[in-house]
Amino acid sequence: MIPLQHGLILSAILFVLGLTGLVIRRNLLFMLIGLEIMINASALAFVVAGSYWGQTDGQVMYILAISLAAAEASIGLALLLQLHRRRQNLNIDSVSEMRG
């Protein structure tokens, strides 16, 4: 069994990597991938904590987080597809410009 500290450190590293990808990248698709990594890192923390204390609540929260991530990914990808059809790119700087 993995110690609690190792699992939480791994989860924190994954969360920071996702946050870094979210902040540094300018492409919306890569920003969405970074957000997915952050959601999965928090779900991993729930599973590790639940396993450490012998509770099944961590696994239930993992299922909830995965369903949330699936809904977020499907809506995000649909919006990205529409944005790509209208603007022909996914750069965040071109999206934030106002017309007029």
Curated annotation (Swiss-Prot):
Protein keywords: Cell inner membrane, Cell membrane, Membrane, NAD, Quinone, Translocase, Transmembrane, Transmembrane helix, Transport, Ubiquinone
Cystine residue pairs: none
Entries under InterPro entries matching the protein: NADH_UbQ_OxRdtase_chain4L/K, NUOK/Mnh_C1-like
Keyword tRNA-binding: no
Keyword Aminoacyl-tRNA synthetase included in the entry's annotation: no
Topological type in the membrane: Multi-pass membrane protein
Gene3D superfamilies assigned to the protein according to its UniProt record, in alphabetical order: 1.10.287.3510
Signal peptide: none
PANTHER family linked to this entry: NADH-UBIQUINONE OXIDOREDUCTASE CHAIN 4L, NADH-UBIQUINONE OXIDOREDUCTASE SUBUNIT ND4L
Protein name: NADH-quinone oxidoreductase subunit K
Source species of the chain: Shigella boydii serotype 18 (strain CDC 3083-94 / BS512)
